[in-house]
């Protein structure tokens, strides 16, 4: 179900919202418990803030995941007149709104996004490049002790120099 929802969301983005700075997709048939996972996948894939909206019993519910350059909670406060409820922090949020307000919600978030194309470029922070000879099975086992990886505990990026691909 998550894969189907992710593919449906990507199809919407590719068809209608590719130029948007904040992705807002409405998946009425998707279960609300999957919205955050799908929003996270959209954020990773497009390197843009993403909000996935689903049809709830009483209102449309949404879950958002953001990038460092976009404070999602603050931006939701700017459109709070359209929302029934919302909460969150800089990188994630939950919300509810009436279905009739979806287009205006999406339009205003994009109009006031304050993001540039530079903000959508993935950033990788490398503390120290590592000689390839340091990568051993033992190191891989040691790194696995740091799991699970995710927000706030990212997979350690590794950088090598002087390598050639043939």
Predicted ranges, named:
Residues 1-101:
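Hydrophobic helix-and-loop "lid/oligomerization" segment in the mid-to-C-terminal part
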Residues 14, 47-48, 110-114, 145-148:
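Non-catalytic alpha-helical coupling and interface elements of nucleotide-dependent molecular machines
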Residues 35-37, 106, 137-140:
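Conserved strand-to-helix beginnings and helix N-cap segments that scaffold or border functional pockets
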Residues 91-107, 116-135:
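Internal, active-site/partner-interface "lid" segment
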Residues 156-160:
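Extended amphipathic alpha-helical scaffolds
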